[in-house]
Amino acid sequence: MVIVNVILGSNRQVAIGKQLFKYLENQIAPLVGERDEITFKFITLDQYHLDFFHEDLPPINNPERKLAPNEQQWIDDMQAADGYIFITPEYNHSIPAVLKNAIDYLAFEGNRKPAKIISYADSMRAGQFGGEALREVINRLGFITLPMITTVGKVTANFSPDGFLLEDAPSGAYYQKKLLETLHEIGFYSRILKGHPYQEFNSKV
């Protein structure tokens, strides 16, 4: 079974991203998961209670890490996945500190695994600068970031707080199709790369 982690990148109690997150969890993931034999694991960062990153060495240079149980759980959950969806808003043309901090704990868990970015906002700009900023961060850690960011604007005009498309959603059909394609795309590449992992180049050949 292929596992894809869906990660909400905001811990704000009133984050409108929760509406999008719940919509994916309740409406879209069951459709794509059953058809494509994908398990989508929905993750909120507040479940890990991560402190600000405080290790003496960068994780990629520290094979002897000693982590607290909650920190190790985050690492283990990311290691177990075959692909990722990051859902992020835009904060001052970047990403939330809580998301950057969680990523800073990672070393090689996402290396050569596919990642899809969904950016969102309550404006038509759809958090696009947050998505682009996130791309640079996860590329540094070796994630294979899929080229096109899925942008979702006017969230509260289209999605209810409990994760349904509103009856009068101005872009409901458009976002339904777009998000179905997003989950199908990450599922496709996760399956391909899990079944055919990259083989390190042997210079002696």
Residue ranges of predicted features:
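N-terminal beta1-alpha1-beta2 submodule of the flavodoxin-like/Rossmannoid cofactor-binding fold
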Residues: 1-88, 93-100, 108, 167-180, ...
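Hydrophobic/aromatic residues located in beta-strands of well-ordered beta-sheets
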Residues: 4, 40, 112-115, 145
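Alpha-helix capping at helix-to-loop junctions
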Residues: 108-111, 140-143, 192
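Short, glycine-/small-residue-rich phosphate/pyrophosphate-handling segment
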Residues: 114-156, 174-177
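Short helix/strand-capping connector loops at secondary-structure junctions
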Residues: 154-170
